Amino acid sequence: VPYTLTRRYVIGVNLNIQEFKQFIKEHIHALEPSGKENPLKVQKRFQLTPREYLSFAENELNNSSDVSRINCVSHLKRALDCQLDTYFHTFNLYELFNKRAIKVKTKLEFIGALGFLNSRSLVRLNNIRNGMEHDYVVPDIADIEVYFDLITALVQLLEHGAFEAAGCDFGIYSDTSCSDFNELIIKYDQHNTSIHVQIKAGEEENNITFTTSAETNIEDFAYMFKVLRMLNLLWDCQWGHEFVLRELEIT
């Protein structure tokens, strides 16, 4: 059975996530941007948008009455829910998450796993959200303003994230190491809600493939979704190699 010279990847078979992480670690400095997939296109699903709910919330925030504060929190909750569902709709995850009755807290954890929120921001957002939405009190104006800023920032991040490329290609070139591989391709399959990786070798029969599906393993899917996002940013030269490795927890 043929092997690469950098590590004993068995050519012609599928990788698991740990093996793929090792592959990225060993080849990331040899990746050269090649091609990109277009962002996904979908039809608008909801009549109102997150931005409109934010506008409603801002109008209420300008009024200091108790009713306006309570209404403001309600609009912010809808802005958050609508933005999460809009983002999931883009990637054809909305129906899957609905079918599984996934709650907002879990949706936020999923978004955090994709790299949109760090753990501290996620905890802070959930703590404020729980206090605002579940306690029978008139919320403090300072807390509302913090909540408003957090929701606005997340809406902006997910709006931008919905227009990220649905895939990217890299050539594999290195003067310092010998590798049997010459191309890395990662793509999002909107129809099957899965992420497909292909690592091309010199001979087609020696190509390595790796696919993870939201339907079968949501944790692995979330990680590979983050890989796709990080490699897109690497392709755009927005982030460096070492930062991508840290974000993907590859040591």
What is each of the regions a protein language model found here?
Residues 10-69, 163-167, 179, 238-251:
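Charged alpha-helical initiation segments
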Residues 43-46, 112, 117-168:
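Charge-enriched, short contiguous segments at helix-coil
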Residues 49-56, 75, 82, 121-128:
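Amphipathic, well-ordered alpha-helical segments in soluble domains
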Residues 56-63, 102-106, 133-134:
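Short, charged/polar, low-complexity loop and linker segments
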Residues 58, 68-89:
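Short, hydrophobic, well-ordered secondary-structure elements
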Residues 88-117:
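Short, charged amphipathic alpha-helical segments flanked by flexible coils
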Residues 172-248:
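N-terminal accessory interaction module
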